[in-house]
C-alpha cells in the first residue's frame, strides 16, 4: 500500500500531468514494488504503460499486469552521468544510445509517440535519458534515487521543449483514498506473494531480510 499510494500520487497528483486515456507512460523498474503498481494504475486510467526491466524473466510479469511492452535496459549501455556538452564525441555517443532507447518505445507502440509521463525512481543513471525521451510538454516525475542522487540535466531539453521535472513524495489523504478505491474495486492486484499468520511473523521478517 505504501508504494501504491506513492505511485498513485506520482501519476495522478500533479495536474495537468495526470494519466489520461491514451497517454504513454514509461515506467522504470516495472517488476518492482513501485513499478508493478504504476503499470496497473496507468492501465486503470486508460493509459499505455511501457515497462523498463533489468532481466528477461521479468517480462511476463509486467505484461500480465497490463504493460503494453517491455524494454530491457541491459540492451543499452549509455547509462550514467551525461558527458559534458563541450565533449562532442562523448555527447554524440550518449545521444546515440538515448535515441535508440526512444526508438524502442516507438517500436512497441507502433507509432512515433513519446511518453507524456516518465515514472522515475532510479535517478542518477537514468534521469538524462528520461528527460530526453519525455514528450514535448510532458513530465518526468521522480520519488527516489536508487542509483544515486547526483543526476545531470541538459537544460536545453527542459526549456526548448517545455518539459517538467517534478519531485513527488508519498501521498496525501486524497491520493491514498484514490489508490485504495482502485484496490477495493479489483482494478489493481496488490501482488502479494504470500500471506502469513500472526504466529509466522518472524518468518516473514526473515524472508524480507533475505530479500
What kind of feature is each model-predicted range?
Residues 20, 134-135:
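Helix-to-beta-strand junctions that scaffold the AdoMet/dcAdoMet cofactor pocket
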Residues 53-61, 149-155, 176-177:
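Short, glycine/polar-rich helix-capping loops at beta-to-alpha or helix-loop-helix junctions
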Residues 16-24, 111-113:
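Short helix-loop-beta connector
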Amino acid at each position: 500500500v505504501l508504494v501504491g499510494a506513492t505511485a498513485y500520487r506520482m501519476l495522478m497528483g500533479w495536474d495537468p500531468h495526470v494519466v489520461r486515456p491514451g497517454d504513454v507512460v514509461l515506467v522504470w523498474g516495472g517488476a518492482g514494488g513501485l513499478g508493478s503498481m504504476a503499470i496497473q494504475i496507468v492501465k486503470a486510467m486508460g493509459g499505455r504503460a511501457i515497462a523498463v526491466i533489468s532481466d528477461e524473466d521479468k517480462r511476463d510479469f509486467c505484461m500480465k499486469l497490463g504493460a503494453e511492452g517491455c524494454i530491457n535496459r541491459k540492451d543499452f549501455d549509455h547509462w550514467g552521468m551525461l558527458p559534458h556538452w563541450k565533449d562532442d564525441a562523448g555527447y554524440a555517443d550518449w545521444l546515440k544510445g538515448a535515441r535508440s532507447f526512444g526508438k524502442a518505445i516507438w517500436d512497441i507502440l507502433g507509432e512515433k509517440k513519446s511518453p507524456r509521463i516518465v515514472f522515475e525512481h532510479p535517478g542518477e543513471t537514468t534521469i538524462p535519458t528520461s528527460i530526453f525521451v519525455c514528450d514535448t510538454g510532458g513530465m518526468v516525475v521522480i520519488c527516489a534515487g536508487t542509483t544515486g542522487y547526483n543526476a545531470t540535466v541538459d537544460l536545453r531539453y527542459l526549456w526548448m521543449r517545455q518539459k517538467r521535472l517534478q519531485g513527488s513524495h508519498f501521498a496525501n489523504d486524497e491520493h491514498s483514498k484514490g489508490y485504495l478505491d482502485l484496490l477495493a474495486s479489483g482494478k489493481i492486484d496488490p501482488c502479494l506473494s504470500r500471506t502469513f499468520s500472526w504466529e509466522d511473523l518472524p518468518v516473514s521478517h526473515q524472508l524480507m531480510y533475505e530479500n
